[in-house]
């Protein structure tokens, strides 16, 4: 446990960041699941709409450092390929 004032402050800040990141990660995963569900249902219009929503979210999370930029690119590429295959 933190023994001095600055270490206690850093622990509090780290916990705030962890909660904030967990919220953002959950939101990102929710939109990804909606896209996957639309693709699985075979509804190209809904899948395209969901993809249009999830793309900027993935880009934003990669820019903020929540996920790696290659992970965002991989998800976008796979979603795009799956939608085109419908």
From Swiss-Prot:
Keyword Ribonucleoprotein: yes
SUPFAM superfamilies named in the record: Ribosomal protein S20 (SSF46992)
Taxonomic source organism: Vibrio cholerae serotype O1 (strain ATCC 39315 / El Tor Inaba N16961)
Function summary: Binds directly to 16S ribosomal RNA.
InterPro entries named in the record: Ribosomal_bS20, Ribosomal_bS20_sf
Region called Disordered, residue ranges: 1-27
Protein family (similarity comment): Belongs to the bacterial ribosomal protein bS20 family.
Gene3D superfamilies in UniProt: Ribosomal protein S20
Keywords, ordered alphabetically: Ribonucleoprotein, Ribosomal protein, RNA-binding, rRNA-binding
Name the UniProt record assigns to this protein: Small ribosomal subunit protein bS20
Sample GO molecular function, one term: structural constituent of ribosome
Stretches assigned to coiled coil: none
GO BP term, example: translation
GO cellular component, one term: cytosol
A Pfam family reported for this protein in Swiss-Prot or TrEMBL: Ribosomal_S20p
Keyword rRNA-binding: yes
